[in-house]
């Protein structure tokens, strides 16, 4: 694992500290978020993607609410 000094050294090597400050890390997180979104949309685990499961669960919840209201 990394020690605190090693992490600090790595973070200090990221350019733009004086001009952008802490915001110099934003592009990394933007790319990371985009990659996660792409994986959730495109990568199939078994036969389903994350959004397939989400849509199915939302539909099941809506159906259960209708049954409870009747």
Swiss-Prot record:
Function of the molecule: Required for the assembly and stability of the mitochondrial ubiquinol-cytochrome c reductase complex (complex III (CIII) or cytochrome b-c1 complex), a multisubunit transmembrane complex that is part of the mitochondrial electron transport chain (ETC) which drives oxidative phosphorylation. Mediates early complex III biogenesis. Participates in regulating the levels of electron transport chain proteins, and therefore energy supply, in response to changes in energy demand. Also involved in the first steps of cytochrome c oxidase complex (complex IV) assembly.
Membrane topology listed for this record: Single-pass membrane protein
Transmembrane region(s): 20-41
Mitochondrial intermembrane topological domain: 42-70
Pfam families, sorted: UPF0640 (PF15114)
Superkingdom, taxonomy of origin: Eukaryota
Entry's Gene Ontology BP terms: mitochondrial cytochrome c oxidase assembly; mitochondrial respiratory chain complex III assembly
Protein name: Ubiquinol-cytochrome c reductase complex assembly factor 5
Keyword annotations from UniProtKB, A to Z: Membrane, Mitochondrion, Mitochondrion inner membrane, Transmembrane, Transmembrane helix
Mitochondrial matrix face of the membrane: 1-19
Organism from which the protein derives: Homo sapiens
Record-level GO cellular component terms: mitochondrial inner membrane; mitochondrion
Localization: Mitochondrion inner membrane
Complexes and interactors: Associates with the mitochondrial ribosome. Interacts with UQCC6. Interacts with MT-CYB; interacts with newly synthesizes MT-CYB. Forms a complex, named COMB/coordinator of mitochondrial CYTB biogenesis, composed of UQCC1, UQCC2, UQCC4, UQCC5 and UQCC6; regulates MT-CYB synthesis and promotes its membrane insertion.
InterPro entries: UQCC5 (IPR028183)
One function term, GO molecular function aspect: mitochondrial ribosome binding
Similarity comment: Belongs to the UQCC5 family.
